């Protein structure tokens, strides 16, 4: 039997199996202090929707997180990042948000870090344009909500069950929410506890 034609398949299969057994912790080290420094004012989706950068941010005591919306994108003296940098604050600002981010999106971002928030200081900017009759639109929800943050939020050990239930109930109101069956199950199981 000639193995030569099957050699690429065998090699790729072996490599695949090796990657299956590699510990996930080897890949989370990709977010370094340099990554934090490079992304502290970038306002990218990687920061807004990701969990690894925000996890590393709250492990560090070097940065002061500021959660907000379009006001973080403005290049004027009232931008919190610019204002605090001019004051020579003891910690560098780390901006998290984007235009169209509303209270629910920022609340989910913070809730995904619930177990890391004890003793931490941060700013949560509440924007007047959030207070409308229609609330968060489906379009903004789809563009800015992160499934990885939702998953991390519901895995927070110290978060009270009634708070998880309220988040599940609110997320179920959006037609494009992922894992609706999981959210329904979570809401139902937590209803018995509250």
Question: What kind of region is each of these model predictions?
Answer:
Residues 63-67, 114, 167, 182, ...:
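Sequence-level detector for tyrosine residue identity
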